Design a protein with these regions (language model features):
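Charged, solvent-exposed interaction patches on well-folded alpha/beta domains
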Residues: 4-11, 17-180
């Protein structure tokens, strides 16, 4: 049964799609498309996102450094698009997004390879996430030149500006024992 063979092949974790054809007189022709992982999906072990934005479960034989995407599975293809745009937009800064999170309310957040978090907010027709990230790239070098510390969080959700949060400085307190 050709259909049973196809279904059996598609149950293999790395197989995205399989085509099976009967060849005369007594052979089968197989065409198999495998998943190409583009990102780790969520926090589940073995959950990956392929290049088509589809979530699948598989074990990687060798660990490969992939970005991590968290969010509602229904928006997985959009998230992959946001990630790809972010890679291109951040290129002038020499930064890469390592984690992209979309909240249940569809707010987008990036964690960059240096640990900085960039809050981008929700996708809006007048000010899409892409434009907010471009504004970050445009103004960040000037901010960095006058800032005493590199910000840990940049909040780009404001229409005409942005907010920075710097990491709290580590303070070492020593107890002095005076006269008693």
């Amino acid at each position: 049964n050709v259909e049973a063979v196809r279904q059996s092949l598609e149950r293999i974790s790395w197989v995205r799609h399989a085509e099976v054809r009967r060849r005369w007189p007594s052979s089968l022709e197989l065409r198999i498309e495998e998943h190409e992982p583009a990102a780790q999906w969520g926090e589940g072990a073995g959950q990956l996102l392929n290049t088509h934005g589809e979530v699948f479960t598989a074990v990687m034989a060798q660990p490969v450094p992939l970005p991590v995407l968290h969010g509602p599975q229904a928006v997985a293809p959009d998230m992959l698009g946001y990630y790809r745009e972010a890679v291109d937009i951040l290129q002038p800064l020499g930064r890469l997004p390592r984690v992209l999170t979309v909240s249940p309310r569809l707010a987008v957040q990036l964690r960059l390879d240096d640990g900085m978090v960039v809050e981008l907010g929700r996708q809006q027709p007048k000010v899409p996430v892409r434009l907010r990230l471009q504004r970050f790239v445009e103004h960040y070098p000037a901010v960095l030149s006058v800032a005493k510390q590199r910000p840990s969080v940049v909040d780009m959700r404001y229409p005409n500006g942005f907010a920075l949060r710097v990491a709290a400085a580590q303070v070492h307190v020593t107890e002095s024992k005076g006269k008693q």
